[in-house]
Design a protein with these regions (language model features):
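Bacterial N-terminal signal peptides that target proteins for export
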Residues: 1-8
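N-terminal signal peptide c-region/cleavage motif recognized by signal peptidases
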Residues: 17-21
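Protease-labile, long low-complexity intrinsically disordered regions enriched in Pro/Ser/Thr
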Residues: 23-405
Length: 405
């Protein structure tokens, strides 16, 4: 599975309405935060997460929505397993619903489930084929040639390599359709964010969800080092992937002893060696009875510090742009496709850890946790996020992997 629990958040800052006669404005930041946890078995193969039965697994038989795609909105003339997108906003330059479109691809697998219902569904064979790649290259050339001030514009198609396409979602404070009851506990946990409702043609949910079956393998390899002895357990952790991995935790539990090794980053093709006995954590209680301060500091608290955006730990509550970061001439036909980083808001990270800290750090034996590089996520799970000319997307993607040996 591409993501055993992922959450992506789009957070829109409050915007102060401008007079209708204003000739120009700065587009409001729409912060897109995607996160996910990918679980691997001892042999490095992905593990399947628990999905709610209300998620879709087949395209709709209803006629497609008549709402025009977000990418066709006028430009301003003056973004794998269980990803979810949550949206927050204190308001925008317009008073109505916020239009958003999402396209997701999976370069190493096939989409399995999604919600709300998509407008378009392509198989992996089609989306990852040579013809789709060529069509995408042509699309990128056409996007680059767009002239924002042109009065006559030729419409652009969406990304032909996307497997799941939502052309015209709307974000509102209240749901436009009755939400479906979920039968997976984690769904209710991540509905409780006070986020905007995401409305499709016939369904409303607190998030956009997508999941795929992929052929990805764990990026790391753990072997004994050349100085290994029973009382001096020397291990080497090698990154065999093409991208760096970050925030690497190796937690080993044996009887009443716990060891935690941490590496801030391991570049592609490089290794990190450690002696297990040098990383014993003192004052540790059994996980079921609660965690002692030293253990929490070495695990959950440390990971939290690495993931929370210290400069912006909470969503914006007012318009936050200045002359230095003013974005103008926005064209809805041009999506945001590249992540600018990985750090999230504190409540997002706390929710991830509330669900996953026991799996990350409380399992018997050896467990390895690491953060995937945003560039890897952009390649393995291409994400495009469109919005109107009054907003611009700032994308962050957090991918965590947990490997239980």
């Amino acid at each position: 599975m591409r993501r055993s629990l992922s959450l992506a958040l789009l957070v829109g800052a409050l915007a102060v309405p401008l007079p209708a006669s204003a000739e120009s404005w700065c587009a409001s930041p729409l912060h897109a935060h995607e996160w996910g946890v990918q679980a691997f078995s001892a042999d490095g193969a992905p593990l399947a997460p628990a999905l709610s039965n209300h998620f879709h697994r087949r395209p709709s038989t209803h006629p497609p929505s008549r709402t025009p795609p977000v990418r066709s909105l006028p430009p301003d003339t003056g973004e794998r397993a269980l990803p979810l997108l949550h949206f927050y906003s204190g308001g925008t330059l317009t008073s109505g619903p916020i239009p958003v479109a999402v396209e997701v691809g999976f370069t190493e697998g096939d989409a399995l489930a999604w919600y709300p219902q998509v407008d378009e569904r392509r198989s992996a064979a089609t989306a990852n084929g040579a013809a789709a790649r060529l069509a995408r290259e042509a699309l990128l050339r056409r996007r680059a040639a767009l002239q924002p001030h042109a009065t006559a514009r030729t419409g652009l198609d969406g990304d032909p390599t996307a497997q799941l396409v939502w052309n015209a979602l709307s974000l509102t404070p209240e749901p436009q359709h009755r939400p479906t009851r979920a039968d997976a506990a984690w769904v209710d946990r991540f509905r409780d964010f006070g986020a905007l409702w995401v409305n499709g043609a016939r369904e409303s949910e607190r998030f956009v969800f997508y999941e795929a079956v992929t052929h990805e393998r764990v990026a790391l390899e753990l072997t004994r080092g050349d100085r290994y002895r029973p009382d001096h357990r020397h291990f080497v952790l090698r990154n065999r992937g093409a991208h760096a991995v970050h925030d690497v935790f190796v937690t080993h539990r044996e009887r009443d002893r716990v060891f935690v090794f941490f590496a801030p980053s391991i570049p592609a093709g490089r290794s990190a060696g450690f002696v297990l006995e040098a990383h014993a954590v003192t004052d540790v209680l059994p996980w079921s009875a609660g965690s002692a301060a030293d253990f929490v500091a070495a695990t959950r608290a440390r990971l939290r510090e690495r993931l929370v955006d210290a400069d912006s730990p909470t969503p914006p509550t007012s318009m936050q742009w200045s002359r230095d970061d003013c974005v103008m001439m926005r064209d809805p036909a041009i999506p945001t496709t590249t992540a600018e980083g990985h750090r999230l808001y504190a409540h997002e990270v706390d929710a991830i850890l509330d669900v996953w800290a026991g799996t990350f750090f409380g399992s018997p034996g050896t467990t390895i946790v690491y953060r995937e590089d945003p560039a890897y996520l952009d390649r393995a799970m291409p994400l495009s996020i469109y919005t109107d000319m009054y907003n611009h997307v700032k994308l962050r993607r957090l991918g965590l992997a947990v490997w239980r040996l």
